[in-house]
């Protein structure tokens, strides 16, 4: 059962067709999502400028969530990507060759548990016995666990439907599920389109860090490329943190969400790239231990085993 769970967590949802062909020479393959600073970096074209002197081009691939992105890294389809806190934990437990190389500050209000505006569910405690949609192995998986814990509801006392964001929204709108645990920009879009009510966000429960992860061999072979990506992220963070209107306007046609709605997600995002430190390693270890104690990981893991070592 555990093997089945971990396999589904990082390998499910339409990734069987991902190519495992060797990387194109002198190209870095980056996985991104609709959420986070990587998508901003992509739209500004800054990374291409940074990598040109190194003789590298950039290939971008969008994923619906972190688990799917890290399965791509695991099978050799991408070299670098960004996810939240939970996906690399499941991926590490499954043997994915990843390294943590950087992270962003907390953004706890960027994820939430939503219910329909006229739902009789008023508190997290009311979720007992209810059906909740979420993307398996994602940040909101851990967020839901912590929200239930605070409300005195056992994880086993709710019924979870593991669905990627698009399918989860359809289930939520049709009433097939009672609640939906989701992150931005899907969170912001659902608030606007469905008038969904926020039952709880991550405030006081989770940090909701954004992590940057690199494939081990690629990192060892091309440390200067990884450093250039991080330098570009640091630069784009500094540019974006006070330009929420501009960022929303630029990303709107790319992610398919109107700029005024997307601005809410941009404002809830955190900015300021940080090197991996002992404090965030300890936070990640706590999350990993929680999943293991609930029987959701096949083995205990040590986050410190997959941290990029300083290059100098």
Give the role of each language-model region.
Residues 220-296:
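Secondary-structure end/capping motifs
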Residues 43, 65, 69, 84-87, ...:
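Stable alpha-helical elements in mature extracytoplasmic
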